[in-house]
């Protein structure tokens, strides 16, 4: 018995890991280091190419619930994240290099997983396969996937934020603080006056960008929108988004700044910080010029500039079942961002479910699905339910089904905690049956 997993990103490593728990051999194909996508830089598996944050740990946030659900199913990604975490207040952020290394070593030392470093250009039709090649799937494989799905792929863009060397930040202007003084002071804050903000705004919206094709310009996903695109929506849009000053007091003035740029720790040793919300497609020379207008970053050393890259995903509502296998080819499963889920953990969670169902299929068992009153179940239902305009979706309480009794509770936090409690009970019950 053997299952093929194509792609060793977050979804792929989860699929391979969970399949091995059933005693089934896995052939894991990963084209790195022989070939890299435009956004990937390191040899290791499960590389984080956008932010190093895995979002909130709180159960009142859907991302917090998703984490707990994944842990119930023995998530390797969550195990690695907790082992390589960096301080980030109420969020779970990781040292991206240690995180990828942790996962890579776990996969390499799993006796049931064979790793083949080759590019796959065709999906095998005669094997049980999990396709988890991500949003930067190669053109040759996309062409074959398009034949499999009998539909055109959809395209959108992600943007990665720049990373700055902490020692190059001017702390006579920048300062450490958390919003409303909640949690530890994990963020570096660069305060702006109205004049400084407006100058930055005008330079940003007029800066040179790396051009994209006309038909692709409107396909930016809101969750990772380039800062310059956000700025073009209005002069104050950034001040109500990533540059919002509320809850921050400048120790120099004792007052709330007009705007604040925040930087979050990117590595455990605290040497590198990423610019929160500053995903961008500005040319590198323009990033250096414009972002150095931010107070405290006048001499900033950028160890990585922001990059813009194409993401591709299948039209899941048309071609995928709630068990994550193709309607036309039940032996071929899809997982990760290529299915239209958006986000690190969202991708990883679908890898777990696809892996479980691939294993169950080869063992002659019925596939499982989580109900829509769980976070994972709601995500999968969203991407597999037919809709007129299918767009990527990340974890949020808005897509989770609730019963009438819970819906009557007016206190939002109490309501979310009850939803989370019920969801986790369902997950535990199912996990006990699956892994008994």
UniProtKB/Swiss-Prot annotation:
The protein's name: Methylenetetrahydrofolate--tRNA-(uracil-5-)-methyltransferase TrmFO
Cellular component GO terms, alphabetical: cytosol
Keywords: Cytoplasm, FAD, Flavoprotein, Methyltransferase, NAD, NADP, Transferase, tRNA processing
Organism: Caldicellulosiruptor bescii (strain ATCC BAA-1888 / DSM 6725 / KCTC 15123 / Z-1320)
EC number(s) on file: 2.1.1.74
Keyword Methyltransferase among UniProt keywords: yes
Binding site for FAD: 7-12
Taxonomy, superkingdom: Bacteria
Gene that encodes it: trmFO
Highest classification ranks of the organism: Bacteria, Bacillati, Bacillota, Bacillota incertae sedis, Caldicellulosiruptorales
